[in-house]
Amino acid sequence: MNIEHLNNRNWYLAQYNTAGKNRESLFSWLNEQNVVPWTPLITRKIRRADSRCCYRERIFAIFPGYFFILANFDIQPVSALRRHSAFIDFVKFGGEIKPVNKDIVDGLMKIYPDPVLNPGAREELNAASSIWLTKAQYQYLLRMENTLQPESRISLLLELVSNAEHHGFIVNIP
């Protein structure tokens, strides 16, 4: 893949099947296709049922069933990316697949930076670590993080992606 193809990549929002190990399988396959998948993940300690003072660490998706994908549709056609059984579809706004504002993804990467949880997006996570968020951007992302119900976080994400300029994110999509 040459540098021109790397420069023409955009972030898109897509959905995946959450059953079993589908996320890991899909992300591994997308990495093989030279596409960068990423979703905000966190680890939480869950008390074990068989012991009073033991915990397990579990990985949870902030937006279950949703992920961001960095791709150039001239190189990786949409139909080729939809081939994996865990890939549901791209999120459409106004009936079409639209790029997500890069600042939104960078802001989320700044808040959820763990490269161990997302090894395929290591370069993008490193780049996002040096950005600065405005007060409005940070407050909206913090509001999403503090929302307990995943369904509510997903609706806040969809609102943010469709109306980025109303939440402090400048429209900079080509």
Give, region by region, the residue ranges found by the protein language model:
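Acidic-enriched and Gly/Ser
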Residues: 2-174
